[in-house]
């Protein structure tokens, strides 16, 4: 594999020599950093089983190597990487897999280790959505996830990835993560804090990642991380699990942050060792039981993961002074909800008791029941999935609801050819050889729902959202 030139400040190299255990070779560390990062993907088991995915993609000649800490994760090699970007494959467009760095699959593996089955989870720094979607898959779209992102520009990307993967149990917020301890005390069974960090572990992906690095900036970032983990710990219920992770390598932003929390709440913090998380985990194990992953150990990005339990309650923080505002939705009455459910089933949309119907003007939404306890405590950027808009002739079903709820076995499902599916993703109407009978047609490809179309004569009118329309070369190889 080709080398690339990574910029290393001298002070960084000194710090790494001190941080690295004697069992590891510093020369191996430098060599690993110079190698480009291996590509990796995670199968979205909300859409397809791993076995079915492997069978579906077998004709492509992809080399898929299992990632030890994630049953759904694989390093991927393709003979001609430039011929078609992974993001333009049919399987990616329909949400069958997520392009995710292997080491970033570790925190969620730790969160659900030892049979942990949380019902309400918070992802404090969620964009672009790799870990939120991984959590949702582990929860099988049950329970509820609060996915927060401080950066306004990244909330849109987070929502797009959640929608593509067919996730229905997520509420999105846009806050500084330091507010949650006061705003939502003891509300979560599990919390993932993948903290903002100095990014020392990502040099294999970005050779210039350390251009603005300094020991002083590490100290400043660590101060913010301490405030974030303190807030997250307050939002965690007693008995709950907190996973703290970063993609950096210095001890100041990693072990020291966790040790600070234990010193602050000595009777409430229990470190849960991760040495048995997967075969070979002991190679990265610290004396505290954390995983400090240097890039040469598993040939991946540098990463850090700690898991801890809140063993007892801690003093609550003063209530926040901000006003949430009126919640603009109201629950749909049972009789009307039954009519809506029946109409939705007619086009192949079904949902279980984990979701409840709410209404705002002419909009119909499905919210996860597990998030209702948070209503009135925080302001949501987006909650659940938009099911439909009502109009005089019935309902205008929404694309995100189709992707999350549709059954491809519905009587009105219509399977497209590869060429027709590509036309669909380009936002064009489709002219199948044999037009379907129904007026509302659930469009599928590879037996996966990809949208809803209106039949007009022999034409299927495209309803694919404009913001998702793709140009350029797609999976049939035609530009």
From Swiss-Prot:
Q: Name one GO molecular function term.
A: rRNA (cytosine-C5-)-methyltransferase activity
Q: Using the UniProt record, name the top-level EC class of this enzyme in a single word.
A: transferase
Entry-linked InterPro entries: Methyltr_RsmF_N, MeTrfase_RsmB-F_NOP2_cat, MeTrfase_RsmB-F_NOP2_dom, Nol1_Nop2_Fmu_2, Nop2p, RCMT, rRNA_ssu_MeTfrase_F, RsmB/NOL1/NOP2-like_CS
What is a single Pfam family found in this protein's UniProt entry? Methyltr_RsmF_N
- Lineage top rank: taxon: Bacteria
Q: Where in the cell is it found?
A: Cytoplasm
Question: Where, by residue number, does S-adenosyl-L-methionine bind?
Answer: 125-131, 149, 176, 194
The catalytic activity, as recorded, is: cytidine(1407) in 16S rRNA + S-adenosyl-L-methionine = 5-methylcytidine(1407) in 16S rRNA + S-adenosyl-L-homocysteine + H(+)
> What keywords appear on the UniProt entry?
Cytoplasm, Methyltransferase, RNA-binding, rRNA processing, S-adenosyl-L-methionine, Transferase
Q: Which GO terms describe its cellular component?
A: cytoplasm
**GO biological process assignments:** rRNA base methylation
Q: What is its EC number?
A: 2.1.1.178
Residues of the active site? 247 (nucleophile)
Could you confirm whether the keyword Transferase appears in this record? yes
List, alphabetically, the NCBIfam families matched: nop2p (TIGR00446), PRK11933.1 (NF008898)
Protein family: Belongs to the class I-like SAM-binding methyltransferase superfamily. RsmB/NOP family.
Q: By what name is this protein known?
A: Ribosomal RNA small subunit methyltransferase F
Q: Which organism is it from?
A: Escherichia coli O7:K1 (strain IAI39 / ExPEC)
């Amino acid at each position: 594999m080709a080398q690339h030139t990574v910029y290393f400040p001298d002070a960084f190299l000194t710090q790494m020599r001190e941080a690295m255990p004697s069992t590891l070779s510093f020369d191996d560390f430098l060599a690993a950093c110079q190698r480009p990062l291996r590509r990796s993907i995670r199968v979205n088991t909300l859409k397809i089983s791993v076995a079915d995915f492997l069978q579906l993609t077998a004709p492509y000649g992809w080399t898929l190597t299992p990632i030890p800490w994630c049953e759904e994760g694989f390093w991927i090699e393709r003979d001609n990487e430039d011929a078609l970007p992974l993001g333009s494959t049919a399987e990616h467009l329909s949400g069958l897999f997520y392009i995710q760095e292997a080491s970033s699959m570790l925190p969620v593996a730790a969160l659900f280790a030892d049979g942990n089955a949380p019902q309400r989870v918070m992802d404090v720094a969620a964009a672009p959505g790799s870990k939120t979607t991984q959590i949702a898959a582990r929860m099988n779209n049950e329970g509820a996830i609060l996915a927060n992102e401080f950066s306004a520009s990244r909330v849109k990307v987070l929502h797009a990835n959640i929608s593509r993967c067919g996730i229905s149990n997520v509420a999105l917020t846009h806050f500084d993560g330091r507010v949650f301890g006061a705003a939502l005390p003891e509300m979560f069974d599990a919390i993932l804090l993948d903290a903002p960090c100095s990014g020392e572990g990502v040099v294999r992906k970005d050779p210039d990642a350390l251009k603005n690095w300094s020991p002083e900036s590490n100290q400043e970032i660590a101060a913010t991380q301490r405030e974030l983990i303190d807030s997250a710990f307050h939002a965690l219920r007693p008995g709950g699990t907190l996973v703290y992770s970063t993609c950096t390598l210095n001890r100041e932003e990693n072990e020291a942050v966790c040790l600070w929390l234990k010193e602050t709440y000595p009777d409430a913090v229990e470190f849960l060792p991760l040495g048995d998380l997967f075969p070979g985990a002991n190679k990265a194990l610290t004396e505290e039981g954390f995983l400090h992953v240097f890039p040469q150990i598993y040939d991946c990005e540098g990463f850090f993961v700690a898991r801890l339990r809140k063993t007892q309650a801690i003093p609550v923080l003063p209530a926040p002074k901000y006003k949430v505002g009126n919640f603009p939705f109201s629950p749909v009455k049972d009789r009307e909800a039954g009519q809506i459910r029946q109409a939705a089933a007619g086009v192949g949309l079904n949902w279980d008791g984990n979701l409840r119907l709410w209404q705002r003007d002419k909009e119909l939404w499905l919210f996860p029941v597990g998030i209702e306890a948070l209503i009135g405590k925080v302001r949501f950027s987006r909650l659940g999935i938009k099911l439909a808009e009502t109009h005089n002739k019935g309902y205008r079903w929404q694309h995100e609801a189709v992707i999350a709820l549709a059954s491809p076995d519905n009587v009105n499902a219509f399977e497209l050819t590869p060429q027709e599916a590509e036309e669909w993703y380009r936002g064009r109407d489709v002219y199948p050889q044999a037009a379907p009978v129904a007026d509302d047609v659930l469009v599928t490809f590879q037996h996966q729902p990809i949208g809803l179309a209106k039949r007009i004569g022999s034409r299927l009118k495209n309803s694919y959202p404009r913001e998702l329309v793709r140009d350029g070369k797609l999976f049939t190889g035609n530009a």
